[in-house]
């Protein structure tokens, strides 16, 4: 009986050991499965992160490309604006130059007429004469018209001689007058803006 009991106990111990080994094997298998699941989940998470990074990079690249194109278009627009402004300025300058040259030709033709009127006025002794008054009126109107177009008489009387404005045709030593001073205007000079149309003809002290 004792021997049978011992055998029974041995069998029970063996069964218990087998059961424990089976449970341990199952637990190990479960751990492996769990680890594989966790690894798979981590890989999935990593893939999602990588996809998000790629999407973010592509978005930034597209944004930078768009900004570069916008900057290039803005630069072209500013250059076109500058070129157009330069074109308008050149066109305006050309118009003004053409206008000045056209006016200069007319003025050059009118100046001798003014000279003739002034000689006639100087020669007239009776300032109350109808002829004198008529010539004087026309002379004034002509001078006023030329002034509107930018014509002005060159100052010369008692001024220092300037070869850019005056033409010296005579020299004379005058007491009390420094050298190179204009002592007499023989013919009036005129300029259109800054351009001399006709220099003043003068006598200069020496």
UniProtKB/Swiss-Prot annotation:
CDD domains: GrpE (cd00446)
Entry annotated with the keyword Chaperone: yes
GO cellular component terms, semicolon-separated: cytoplasm
Biological processes per GO annotation: protein folding
Bias-annotated ranges (Basic and acidic residues): 1-14
Segments for region (Disordered): 1-56
Feature: compositional bias, Acidic residues: 24-39
Keywords: Chaperone, Cytoplasm, Stress response
Subcellular location(s) per record: Cytoplasm
Function: Participates actively in the response to hyperosmotic and heat shock by preventing the aggregation of stress-denatured proteins, in association with DnaK and GrpE. It is the nucleotide exchange factor for DnaK and may function as a thermosensor. Unfolded proteins bind initially to DnaJ; upon interaction with the DnaJ-bound protein, DnaK hydrolyzes its bound ATP, resulting in the formation of a stable complex. GrpE releases ADP from DnaK; ATP binding to DnaK triggers the release of the substrate protein, thus completing the reaction cycle.
UniProt similarity note: Belongs to the GrpE family.
A Pfam family that the UniProt record links to this protein: GrpE
Cystines in this chain: none
Oligomeric form and interacting partners: Homodimer.
Name of this protein: Protein GrpE
GO molecular function, one term: protein homodimerization activity
């Amino acid at each position: 009986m004792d021997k049978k009991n011992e055998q029974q106990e041995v069998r029970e111990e063996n069964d218990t050991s087998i059961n424990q080994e089976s449970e341990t094997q199952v637990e190990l298998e479960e751990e492996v499965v769990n680890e594989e699941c966790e690894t798979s989940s981590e890989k999935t998470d990593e893939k999602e992160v990588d996809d998000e990074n790629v999407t973010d990079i592509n978005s930034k690249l597209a944004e930078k490309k768009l900004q570069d194109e916008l900057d290039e278009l803005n630069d072209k627009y500013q250059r076109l604006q500058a070129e157009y402004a330069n074109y308008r300025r050149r066109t305006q300058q050309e118009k003004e130059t053409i206008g000045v040259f056209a006016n200069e030709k007319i003025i050059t033709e009118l100046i001798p007429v003014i000279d003739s009127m002034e000689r006639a006025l100087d020669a007239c002794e009776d300032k109350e004469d109808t002829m004198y008054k008529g010539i004087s009126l026309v002379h004034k109107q002509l001078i006023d018209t030329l002034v509107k177009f930018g014509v002005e008489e060159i100052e010369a009387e008692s001024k220092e001689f300037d070869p850019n404005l005056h033409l010296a045709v005579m020299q004379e030593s005058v007491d009390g007058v420094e050298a190179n001073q204009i002592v007499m205007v023989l013919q009036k000079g005129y300029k259109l803006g800054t351009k001399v149309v006709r220099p003043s003809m003068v006598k200069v002290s020496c």
